[in-house]
Amino acid sequence: MEPVFEGADISWEIRDDTLYLRGKGDMTFLRDEEKDRLDIPWYYEDFTRVSFEGNITSIGPEAFHTSDLVEIDIPDSVEHIDALAFCSCRSLEKVRFGRHLRSIGGYAFEDCVKLRRVVLGGCVEVVDYSCFEGCSSLISFETSPVLRSVGERAFFGCSSLVRISLTEKVLRVAGNPFAGCSSMKEIEVSPFSSVYSSADGVLYNRPRSVLISVPGGTEGAFTVPDSVVEIGRDAFHGSRVASVVIPATVRSIDVAAFKDCRELRSVTIAHEEARHGVRFRDRILKGEMFCGCSSLEEVVLPEDLETVEFGAFEGCSSLRTVRIPASVERINERAFKGSGIKEIELPENLEYLGPMAFESCASLESVKLNEGLVTIDSAAFRGCSSLGEIDIPESVVEIEADAFEGCTGLRKAILRSSAIDPGDIFPEGVETIVPDSE
């Protein structure tokens, strides 16, 4: 048998389609600086099984990444599985976890698309970020009785997983680890938990002031309870809800809260007389909040909003009407990219229009730019093939060269700013009018 590297306490060989590992201690690898990756000696070898001998205490990072493993028994001596250890083992169907395993690193079993059932060992305390992300065949997951931490995106896209139970030992759930679990009906929490709770299968913090996760299989109308003051990151991500009612108690909605809710048609934000709907934290509509909501048709934004963050309405292909309040100063990258809006009037206080802000809005026919706008960034209107005319106000001092690239329907551009050289800004054949030179 050969050592994993010179001086290592673990050696290896392959016989009859099986990788044999023998030794003691942690499995570590040297870094191949020339190839800029870990030097895993069996990386290019073919095997479908692994046999452990001795007292190996960890499985190293990327140890079996993209291998053809079909099943594996992790010995009781192993206490930790490092990041990416079994990532993209697309033939892996069965894993038996050892009794003394304590933690599983990020992306460890990501994209193991044939893995169907997981029963964690009795000592597992940490399931890290994206650990089982993309395990689309996973139908059953039994947690460890001592599990205390579930990382962000730990089960993202586990589209066959129907339910999951969290014991009272769980003290940390990062973001919404169950986003994109399109078949999930229930997240169950032990009634003895001091940190989390569940009602009708929905995950909340213990006092139910923070909505953490609406199961992806939730359909139809959903009313956020009056106890909720915050809707967390990815809370509805990928769910099948058609409508959501948000009470006046809610003061904050976080990043990607409704991302990829493809059946979502309406979001109603209630308000008290003294308040004007949700006061988005820092007056910011968070990034990707409605990204991919392809059935959403109309949006009314709160009057005190100042920033529309990245990708907020990206891919909202049914969205036809948006009124942007006068208070908005920034529209960031990809904010409305690929949406179905037909016309847009930029608010009077807008100073910044980010890259790709309205890129690929193929139905966009009319744009009114505000006096006060300073920059039109890269690809801001690229691919807006229905746009026929554009009037650039005097305040604009910079337009990126590809801002109007692919605007095949553009016939006329009025350029009021003396700071801009029309050059190659507009597509060939566009009539460019500079009023001062008339």
Feature locations, PLM:
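Short, mixed-charge aromatic SLiMs
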Residues: 424
